[in-house]
């Protein structure tokens, strides 16, 4: 399956005004993609679209809630009317709730599923309708919690499990029908976005994402890569792969670790803000890629480098291994040579000294005939090197 170069693509991005979606929109625009941007806040969309167009890019927007299938369908039609086609559809919009499952009202639980799951289902179905003849890519944003659930974000974990199941099933059906559509599930680890700030909170403290955090640029880079190269799934960050493997291969151990750290890992240390604004029902107008809290952020990932550039990474690792082997071998050779030279010098000095002592009568002639044994005894008695 051949996908267009990003500079020739028309890309639809949901959740385009915050976090991963915003970073992806800006990066894709810089790469030359034409964009149809979707989010709920029209003011933020207008500002972002103006920013991209004034910088030499090409973007239009459609304000809608992805849980509204009819409005989302209109977004797809707008992309066709503006650009003539769609090449990649990125289902990124999502939200979360912090709180124990039994403490969260059912209406809020349902709202997360409407956005995170039904938004992906609607978007994917619309995308298949547009892509089934000319081909293209559907990229759904899952999470490491698609494989490894996290307490206090139970409904978010459940929604991302649903996204994974839906995406995998849709991929199988599309491939069985022979449709030229690549379907990718992106599974990021903790990313430094306003995610905790925009989540509704039922905890007594302000939540945080457990570290280490990765830069949203890594997710955007992966999305753009998958828009050009068919990829089944893509973990973002080494920790995502680790958590997924642990949860699947040692589930009881994973559960125990989560039980022991249920509060500490997600507690920012700050008391909960009363009447804080969250994005569950109403969005804000900020264009914010990264979280407000000062956190250590990993700007790169060796795992991702290897995933995107496997041959280059293999070559670099092989080259590094050869270089290390050469350095170690050279040092061992120098050490061996140096030891031989020192032994020869010691033996020579010992023979000269013993000969001198023998002539002066200090030691016997028999002792003088064995300088090497005398020197060896000195080494093993602790008086040598």
Q: Which residues does each PLM region occupy?
A:
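Hydrophobic alpha-helical topogenic segments used for membrane insertion/localization
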Residues: 307-333
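SDR active-site lid
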Residues: 176-269
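Conserved glycine-rich Rossmann-like NAD(P)H-binding loop of the short-chain dehydrogenase/reductase
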Residues: 31-48
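Substrate-binding pocket helix/loop in short-chain dehydrogenase/reductase
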Residues: 100-101, 108-110, 316
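Active-site helix of classical SDR
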Residues: 124, 159
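The beta1-alpha1 cofactor-binding region of Rossmann-like NAD(H)/NADP(H)-dependent oxidoreductases
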Residues: 42-43, 63-74, 106
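Conserved glycine-rich cofactor-binding loop
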Residues: 10, 17-19
């Amino acid at each position: 399956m051949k996908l267009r170069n990003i500079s020739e693509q028309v890309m639809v991005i949901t959740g385009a005004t915050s976090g991963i979606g915003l970073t992806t929109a800006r990066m894709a625009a810089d790469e030359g993609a034409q964009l149809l941007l979707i989010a709920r806040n029209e003011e933020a969309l207008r500002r972002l679209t103006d920013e991209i167009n004034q910088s030499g890019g090409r973007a239009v927007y459609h304000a809608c809630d992805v849980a509204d299938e009819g409005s989302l369908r209109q977004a797809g039609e707008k992309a066709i009317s503006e650009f003539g086609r769609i090449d990649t559809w990125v289902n990124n919009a999502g939200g979360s709730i912090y709180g124990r499952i039994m403490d969260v009202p059912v209406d809020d639980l349902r709202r997360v599923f409407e956005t995170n799951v039904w938004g992906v289902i609607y978007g994917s179905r619309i995308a298949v309708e547009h892509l089934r003849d000319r081909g293209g890519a559907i990229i759904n944003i899952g999470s490491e919690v698609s494989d490894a659930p996290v307490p206090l974000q139970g409904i978010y974990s459940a929604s991302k499990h649903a996204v994974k199941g839906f995406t995998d099933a849709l991929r199988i059906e599309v491939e069985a029908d022979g449709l030229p559509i690549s379907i990718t599930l992106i599974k990021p680890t903790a990313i430094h976005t306003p995610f905790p700030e925009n989540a509704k909170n039922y905890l007594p403290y302000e939540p945080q994402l457990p570290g280490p955090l990765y830069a949203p640029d890594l997710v955007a880079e992966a999305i753009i890569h998958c828009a050009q190269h068919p990829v089944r799934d893509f973990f973002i960050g080494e920790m995502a792969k680790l958590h997924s493997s642990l949860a699947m291969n040692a589930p009881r151990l994973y559960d125990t670790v989560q039980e022991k750290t249920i509060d500490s890992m997600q507690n920012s240390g700050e008391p909960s803000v009363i009447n804080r604004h969250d994005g569950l029902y109403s969005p804000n107008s900020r264009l914010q890629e990264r979280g407000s809290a000062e956190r250590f952020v990993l700007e790169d990932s060796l795992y991702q480098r290897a995933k995107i550039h496997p041959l280059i990474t293999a070559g670099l690792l092989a080259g590094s291994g050869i270089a290390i082997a050469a350095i170690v071998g050279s040092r061992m050779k120098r050490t061996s040579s140096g030891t031989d030279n020192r032994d020869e010098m010691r033996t020579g000095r010992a023979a000269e000294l013993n000969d001198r002592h023998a002539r002066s009568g200090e030691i016997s002639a028999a002792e003088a005939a064995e300088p090497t044994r005398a020197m060896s005894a000195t080494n093993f008695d602790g008086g040598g090197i």
